[in-house]
Amino acid sequence: RAAALIGLIGASSIVGRLGLGALGAKVGPIRLMQAAFGVMASSYAIWLAADGRYGVLVLFAVVLGVGYGGFIALSPAAVAVMFGTNGMATILGATYTGAGIGGLIGPPLAGAIIDSSGFNAGITYALITAGVSTVVLYTLPVARVAQT
């Protein structure tokens, strides 16, 4: 059943990539990307509330997948709107390097938190981190740079 949840995150990510990517082309990628981050943060609250109930875990997987897929699809467009296309590869490289560092540090940190304080503490940490990140994203000024 756990493997099915992982697969569901991946399938929902496709929906997020295609759906939010297309919507971003119509309404603008920046605020929609910020919303996708908020959706990911809310997924951890759903996971925390699941208390082992599989149906709620399915909801968590779908919400996380859609939010994550939207973030992946909208990031390059948001960078282009905010910074223009000159140097876009460098900016995206820095952005994805930051994500890679999180991917490197996150799992051992989560493991240490779970080992010392329990599974729910690990989920709570993820919720707090994602929530703070969402707030920070919403406080950033949204300036548009002329295309070059």
Residues covered by each model-derived region:
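C-terminal transmembrane helical hairpin of 12-TM major facilitator-type secondary transporters
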Residues: 1, 7-13, 17-20, 24-81, ...
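Glycine/proline-centered helix-kink
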Residues: 17, 103-111
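Alpha-helical transmembrane segments of multi-pass secondary-active solute transporters
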Residues: 2, 32, 91, 113, ...
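Paired intracellular helix-loop junctions of major facilitator superfamily
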Residues: 79-89
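Glycine-rich segments within core transmembrane alpha-helices of 12-TM secondary carriers
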Residues: 93-106
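Symmetry-related core transmembrane helices of the 12-TM Major Facilitator Superfamily/SLC fold
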Residues: 122-139
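Interfacial helix-cap and linker-helix signal at transmembrane-aqueous boundaries
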Residues: 23-24, 109-118
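Intrinsic disorder in cytosolic terminal tails and internal cytosolic loops
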Residues: 140-148
